[in-house]
Amino acid sequence: PTIDYDEWTPEELAFDEQKPTGISDTIIDTLANEHCCIVQGPPGTGKSYTIASVISSYLDAGKTVCVTTMANKGLIELIKQKPLQKYVKGGRVSKTNLSIDERKQVSGVKAASADLQVPGGEILCATNYQLSSVYSEKKMTLYGLPKYDLIVIEEASQAFLTAIVAFKQLGVDCLIVGDPMQLPPIVKLNNPQYNS
């Protein structure tokens, strides 16, 4: 679907002590009705905790979730969020390129399978680079494209638009999360012809 800016009506979500799950509930409702939701906010506004709460509701329903971001650090920070701790402890969180340090940092996270698939009630955490490998001819021939009930594209302001479009195709529902204060992706060309 194309976004028509005349119809773009973002809704500001604020924490309400009377309804502490109000923000995540609104996002879950939007995903159920629209199958896509964009969440943006500056640092320190609780995006990671809110995302973890949304993911938790999908996992509780036995659904599959994939989270992708530019850097491993962002994935680890999300995995550490309180709403996801029971899944980490239960061995229901997989991550691509899981290092020894990450295993120590977040005990219970397991290495992702080569096909980047997860069973119902589990989450895959992959960098944008690793997740984009599912579109390689070799992986598509071997495994086909994975499909997730929810795909979460974190740090979307740093991702290329083509990556967002490709990753969105992997999910039934798509949650796009970004910080409008972050810089967009930077491409450096070493060819002097383009550096004028």
Show where each model-derived region lies.
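Pre-P-loop entry segment of helicase/translocase ATPase cores
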Residues: 1-35, 91, 96-121
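Short secondary-structure boundary/capping segments
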Residues: 82-85, 139-142, 190-194
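Conserved RecA-like ASCE P-loop NTPase motor core of nucleic-acid helicases/translocases
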Residues: 42-83, 90
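Conserved helicase motor core of SF1/SF2 NTP-dependent helicases
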Residues: 61, 69-73, 129-131, 145-196
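A short acidic, amphipathic alpha-helical/loop segment
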Residues: 50-54, 81, 136-140, 162-170
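Conserved helicase/translocase P-loop NTPase motor core
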Residues: 115-145
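Pre-Walker A (Motif I) flank of P-loop NTPase domains
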Residues: 33-39, 63
